[in-house]
From Swiss-Prot:
It holds the Pfam family GGR_cat. InterPro entries: FAD-bd, FAD/NAD-bd_sf, Geranylgeranyl_Rdtase_fam, Geranylgeranyl_reductase, GGR_cat. NCBIfam families: GG-red-SF (TIGR02032). This is Uncharacterized protein Mbar_A1602.
Amino acid sequence: MISMKKYDVVIIGAGPAGSYAAYMLAKSKINVLVIDKYSFPRYKPCAGGLTAKAFNSFDFPISKEVKYSTNSIVTSYKNQIFHNISGNKTLVKMIERKEFDDFLIKKAVDSGATFLDGMKVTEITWENAEFSIKTDSEFFRCNYLIGADGTNGIVNRTFNIVERDLYGFAVEINCPVSRDNIGKFNMTFDFGTVPNGYLWIFPKDEYVCVGAYTTNRKMKNIQKYLLDYIEKLGLVPESEKLKGHIIPYYGINYKQPDFPCVLVGDAAGFGEYWTGEGIYYAVKSGTIAAEVISSSIKSGIFDRQALQRRYQREIIRGLKLAYYIGKFFYGNLPLSFNLVMSYLPVGIMYESASRGLTFDQSFSKIHVALSSLILNKSHISNNKYHR
């Protein structure tokens, strides 16, 4: 008879969602195992921008992992009409996912979690109120399972919790830049060039991450848009191979099943349609999953309704609003760009973003943003120019 070590919770995937859930559970003295098929540290394609709502989500300092911070943003339409929007509050902190993810899983391990990397899960079954997990080398059992294994993860493929029918796509490449010249590059979003999406520049410490994002998953030539943009910028990619990844939106339809298997982050489809942001929703969903599971372990009953309520209130509601705003924005360029880049919307968005508000919170607390804007507390400027 094969012996299987049992844990209270097993988490498949050690990205921000899985690692932070493990950290929260381990802090609560819950016996948790994290399994990832890759050996850490590992490369992870991601622009690596932490918005204020993302970097405010951690209950430990992350300053040592930050490559670059900015209180300004440049937006453009077809790389011609530019708006340089700045103020006195931090909007985004840049990280490198390879290092950041390794940092997060180490925080979980330091708190008491067990981590097995370089181990692939090959089969999962749910029987007699527990999960059996088969890997390429071992077997494990648990009462609660968290799927943090991305858009094509085995957890959702096994249990079909949410249909993977809404998603976009992004490609990126790092371009080396000397420390002396990194200040010449701003965090930039160019709309109108890539259909239903944007081009981006995210400065780090000794390189810039340049990428292209589209909400149209069927687009075939997104790589060409990116390479043309890099050439116009006068940059040289660090390699010839572009890295691509899916941006999921299908989490707006997430419904938690009765049995205690919870999806988090990209596995749950928690990505933002308009901006493509994902790290905040990864950490937020990991936090919610950990808190509900901790409470459920104490009570002895999985509280599915509590998890669904919190997902709905704290994640899905904002994602749905971002989805419809994004649909309007990309479907009505350049009118929508000019509208959004006018003084009042820019000011409200700056105040909301710097306060770490989600889309739905931005609307419910618009009076706070307006008050700060009228008093010019953030010293916001919106300089328009042409190239």
